[in-house]
Regions:
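N-terminal secretory signal peptides
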Residues: 1-2
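N-terminal export signals
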Residues: 5-28
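Conserved PLP-enzyme active-site core in the AAT-like
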Residues: 9-10, 14, 31-77, 104-115, ...
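Conserved C-terminal alpha-helix-loop-beta "cap" of PLP-dependent enzymes
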Residues: 54, 332-418
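Generic N-terminal amphipathic, Lys/Arg-enriched alpha-helix
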Residues: 62-72, 83-89, 351-353
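Metallocofactor- and cofactor-centric catalytic cores in central/energy metabolism, strongly enriched
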Residues: 72, 76-77, 83-84, 91-94, ...
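Flexible, glycine/charged-enriched surface loops at secondary-structure junctions
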Residues: 96-101, 115-116, 288-292, 311-320, ...
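Central antiparallel beta-sheet cores of small beta-barrel/beta-sandwich binding domains
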Residues: 430-525, 533, 537-549
Length: 549
């Protein structure tokens, strides 16, 4: 799956996005089994998810990851070499600038880049590189961020296709974002205020695109404007394809394909830029002091890169395929179920994926419902799902599966899909009322309240209208069945998207319930019908231009 598609799914609730009580996500706390009582070594984490799991000791149920390197479910499992390096680093003290210099030199030797740096995650690396391009390593400028008054570099150019939720890291520096869509617009946008160009390494950054890295580099290099490529979810290429293709700096997530520390990022590229980026990073005071990276993560990330150069990548791929083969053979015995394996060749999210397909009318369950069943009940399994035109599917991503997971996953999917189910009702329950009109909603967030408005048009069971928040008005759609109302709106801004899913109950002129906002969790709402009517007014159309202003 392309990272762009993955980003679109971030606003959805984890797994399949259904509306379920949060209490169902947690295991019962085991008061007789604490971290200190057991000793950390007393807990086991394996593909079998035994009862003696460290998460269960605090009432949290672990997950088998067949979804990918999503941070919200843990990203990746660190390599054994990484854990050993982090453990060793924790036992002694070191001067951090000296450590950064040593790591920078070693990363250069390993990757062929001019220099290397470890940040507290990929986004932090993006933030520090942006600061470096704005300040040029001048601490007088650094301590004034995000107030860029008087700075000569204050703008970052981003192709429209590369705008995404992660470019908050760039915006945090206080720069002005300039969007472009064509090479001509890019050429026109570059000026003495341009600090850098940011490109996200998905399909729009490939050679056949108008704003590919190669094309951007041709335009940017005569102006000596640095290019930053965000390759967060990619496999590490040595020599690096992005640096060879014209990028000045490339950033990776440490906790994705490279299987380094979850809270680390890998930054490779021009030494002068990376030295300024390190200056902008913790432990140095300024806008990056809050992005602390410890000696443990720094050496753990270096160990992950060293391990990457020695790993048996073809052997890992073969193992992943064997796991998918086991699952496919098990579920293919169910009548109406077909399977296929997708082996991606692109650099991002590169691991085999098993697609399991069936007709909704035959098994009377959708892929999203299967994903919800697997994701919310023990043993929990995170998978992808989609339904279109009566066909539905689930997909199993192998990159972070662990030995033994394949057997549990095969049995779980088989048990769910092989159940006999009655056909789904095709008719919706009749609505209990007509709720067309304006509704004034009080939204209760975790620590504040907000006034919203819902303008509803009802056509039988179907609803459309507008949702007015504090800053924007967006389209809204949904249903009413009996007195149960479900609505959805999406607040879209360049680089951002927030999904509001309202689930409420109608009682007279009041709708109350919960709002599900995906990664932003939940809120409560109470909406009351606004029966106020505007006074009637006859409109006089002028016969010409105004005679006074």
């Amino acid at each position: 799956m392309k990272r762009r598609s993955i980003i679109k799914s971030l606003t959805m609730i984890p797994f399949a996005g259904a509306l379920v009580p949060f209490k169902s996500l947690f295991a019962a706390p085991r008061h007789d089994s604490t971290l200190l009582q057991n000793g950390i070594d007393g807990f086991v984490g394996t593909g079998g998810l035994p009862e003696s799991n460290i998460f269960q000791s605090i009432g949290v149920e672990p997950i088998i990851n067949c979804r990918g390197t999503f941070t919200i479910i843990g990203g990746s499992v660190e390599r054994p070499e990484v854990r050993k390096a982090m453990e060793a680093a924790s036992k002694d003290f070191v001067q951090y600038d000296e450590l950064a210099d040593g790591i920078g030199k070693r990363l250069a030797e390993l990757t062929g880049a001019e220099w290397g740096m470890v940040s507290s995650g990929c986004a932090a690396g993006m933030k520090h590189v942006t600061a470096a391009c704005v300040t040029g390593g001048n601490p007088e400028k650094l301590i004034r961020i995000p107030d860029l008054s008087g700075f000569d570099k204050t703008e970052v150019v981003i192709p429209k296709s590369s705008r995404n939720v992660y470019d908050h890291a760039i915006r945090n520096i206080g720069v002005k974002i300039i969007e472009v869509s064509t090479p001509e617009e890019l050429e026109k946008a570059l000026n003495p205020r341009t600090a850098m160009i940011y490109i996200m390494a998905f399909d729009e950054a490939q050679p056949n695109q108008p704003l590919s890295l190669a094309n951007v580099a041709k335009i940017a290099q005569p102006h000596k404007i640095p290019i930053l490529v965000d390759a967060a979810a990619e496999v590490l290429t040595i020599p690096n394809v992005h640096l060879q293709g014209g990028a000045d700096v490339v950033v990776y997530s440490g906790g994705k394909a490279i299987c380094g520390p979850q809270c680390a990022g890998l930054v490779l590229g021009k030494k002068d830029i990376l030295m300024s980026a390190w200056q902008a990073s913790s432990p140095h005071h300024g806008p990056g002091r809050d992005n602390k990276v410890g000696r443990e993560e720094m050496l753990g990330m270096l160990a992950a890169v060293e391990a990457w150069t020695k790993r048996d990548h073809p052997g890992e791929w073969k193992t992943w395929l064997s796991w998918l083969d086991h699952i496919a053979k098990k579920v293919s015995t169910i009548e109406g179920v077909t399977t296929s394996v997708f082996e991606p060749t692109e650099l991002s999210n590169r691991s085999p994926v098993l697609n399991i397909n069936w007709d909704v009318a035959q098994l009377n369950i959708t892929g999203e419902e299967v994903a919800e069943e697997l994701g919310r009940n023990k043993p929990r399994v995170a998978i992808g799902a989609q339904t279109k035109d009566g066909k539905t599917s689930i997909n199993i991503t192998t990159g972070q599966m662990q030995p033994g997971n394949d057997k549990i996953v095969a049995n779980r999917i088989y048990d769910v899909l092989s159940q006999k189910r009655n056909p789904k009702p095709t008719e919706l329950d009749a609505p209990s009322a007509n709720i067309s009109g304006r509704w004034d909603a009080d939204i209760e967030f975790f620590s504040s309240t907000s006034k919203h408005a819902l303008v509803i048009e009802q056509d039988g069971n179907w609803i459309q209208g507008l949702h007015k928040g504090e800053f924007t008005v967006r389209d809204m759609r949904g249903t009413i069945e009996g007195n149960i109302i479900k609505l959805r709106s999406v607040d879209r801004l360049p680089g951002d998207s927030i999904s509001f899913i309202f689930s409420g109950t109608l009682a007279g002129d009041t709708i109350s319930g919960s709002i599900y906002m995906g990664e932003y969790r939940t809120a409560k709402f109470v909406a009351k019908r606004n029966n106020n009517k505007l006074p009637r007014e006859k409109i006089v159309v002028p016969g010409g231009p105004p005679l006074a202003t």
